[in-house]
Amino acid sequence: MSDAPSGPPRLVVGVSGGSGIPYALDILRALRGLDVETHLVVSSGAKRVMSAEGGPQLADLTALASVVHDDRDLAAAVASGSYRTGGMLIVPCSAGTLAKVAHGFADNLISRAAHVTLKERRPLVLVVREDPMPRPMLQNMLAAHDAGATVMSASPGFYHAPESLGELLGFVTARVLDQFGLNAPGFRRWREDEA
């Protein structure tokens, strides 16, 4: 997170229209606990998913964010490369958002901020959740990777013997935060007790 300004680290958190909003909530909680300044952008598709799934709602996410931006605001601070951040994550990252990132199509703030993150060579993490993955989606993952993004699946491990949904979410959260050099407190790593 070397490109972040002095003071607390700063990350952009995009939430797009794939199922998996609880991952975004867990990551925002962890980032708040680590005193990371978060700039939240939630797509209209994500808002529809929240309504349909009945899990975490927009107010739950915005309560944990430092700053909330409208996805239609292409003049927001995070739309400019001169606004320094330590990177961006999109969780969940829908197939449509993945395609936009992979091909440089920036028609909303999430895709514009992702484009800026790539052009400034800052870490960009895309957490995809959709299954199965058709060939175009796999090609878009490769294109996003080749452009500089890290593509991760929202797939928890089980070697830490999770006993709750929170522990499953926490596994993915910890792996995402690893990409930014941040440690999720309480995360049990593979064979860590043997080191």
Swiss-Prot record:
Organism ancestry: Bacteria, Thermotogati, Deinococcota, Deinococci, Deinococcales
Stated role: Flavin prenyltransferase that catalyzes the synthesis of the prenylated FMN cofactor (prenyl-FMN) for 4-hydroxy-3-polyprenylbenzoic acid decarboxylase UbiD. The prenyltransferase is metal-independent and links a dimethylallyl moiety from dimethylallyl monophosphate (DMAP) to the flavin N5 and C6 atoms of FMN.
Broad EC category: transferase
E.C. code: 2.5.1.129
UniProt name for this protein: Flavin prenyltransferase UbiX
Residues binding dimethylallyl phosphate, per UniProt: Y159, R175
Keyword Transferase annotated: yes
MF (Gene Ontology): carboxy-lyase activity; flavin prenyltransferase activity
Entries under SUPFAM superfamilies matching the protein: Homo-oligomeric flavin-containing Cys decarboxylases, HFCD
Gene3D superfamilies to which the protein is assigned, alphabetical: Flavin prenyltransferase-like (3.40.50.1950)
Record Pfam families: Flavoprotein
Catalysis performed (reactions): dimethylallyl phosphate + FMNH2 = prenylated FMNH2 + phosphate
Keyword field: Flavoprotein, FMN, Prenyltransferase, Transferase
Species assigned in the record: Deinococcus radiodurans (strain ATCC 13939 / DSM 20539 / JCM 16871 / CCUG 27074 / LMG 4051 / NBRC 15346 / NCIMB 9279 / VKM B-1422 / R1)
Residue numbers binding FMN: G17, G18, S19, S43, S94, A95, G96, T97, R129
InterPro entries for this protein: Flavin_trans-like (IPR036551), Flavoprotein (IPR003382), UbiX-like (IPR004507)
Membership in a protein family: Belongs to the UbiX/PAD1 family.
HAMAP family linked to this entry: ubiX_pad
